């Protein structure tokens, strides 16, 4: 049996993944997001993806800059190819937003991408789906079993209905959360058990950033030798609701090899009750520490993973980072204190202790 492999790319404060799947005699490549920068030194996404002659599925989980820029660049580079190298694209983009080509605005990039994808699709070169939500039919995919678990139909409909209005209001939202750095600093001195018991803020669909993340595509992929819960920047309540509806519970947990932690380890994109119905010891966190108003991961997120009620503390938790921990901590401060060692965890980056189904560049 061939070994499927999840490749975890350094993507600054964003996400970029390549999954090479095998299922029996079939194999295929899935690309998930593309990071925030077109500089190949800072974001190796373009160079790595160009090594793949044929991509079976490309997923842009949502249209924030830190997920879309590399994918947008790849599509622009190949849009005029006689044979477009991607079979399918899943992009829940706001294509109805009539805005000119611009720079450094996620919505403008998504609209420009939508125009391009429409032309490629109309020419019969690829299959573009712009309405991917929980329960989306993936039965014709032969190289892996893929189950889309978020967003819900209701959330995605709200996204399309409200997008233009919220985009217009985006400039009125605070550009900087001045309390974030102070909170991060205070959290360093709070024990993880206490942090894990904090109440989470609920997403506000009337805020642009929250709505975009609520519409993020989350899915489970299963192939030979690999299973992963890929959460994009989704919020936990919707993911948990879907899983419980499918019969998962504290007594019948979802078993996966890896969880790609949502939103780079942001504290409000995880919950104890979601973790309680997942059986997994390997957690992937994609971040270099964040940028601007973002400080990732939150120590509170690590606390949830290590201290939620349903955890079997006899099994070590493995955290996989795509940047050395000391680089991340230069921005967010110390994530683990000396007394945290008792919680039984192991830190990994590309230089130490990777399982054979995970690769970190």
Language model features with spans:
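His/Asp/Glu-enriched short active-site or ligand-binding loop at hydrolase and phosphoryl-transfer sites
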Residues: 284-289, 321
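Long, well-ordered mid-to-C-terminal structural blocks that present hydrophobic/aromatic surfaces
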Residues: 219-274
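Active-site metal-binding motif and surrounding structural segment of the metallo-beta-lactamase
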Residues: 27-28, 40-89, 249-268, 277-284
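Flexible, acidic/histidine-containing loops and adjacent segments that form or flank the divalent-metal
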Residues: 2-3, 78-227, 315-361
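Short, solvent-exposed loop/turn segments that connect beta-strands within catalytic domains
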Residues: 22-28, 82, 312-314
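C-terminal regulatory/interaction regions
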Residues: 1-6, 12-15, 237, 241-249, ...
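Active-site environment of divalent metal-dependent phosphoester hydrolases
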Residues: 13-15, 36-39, 63-69, 96-99, ...
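Conserved beta-strand hairpin/beta-sheet module of binuclear metal-dependent hydrolase folds
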Residues: 2-52, 211-237
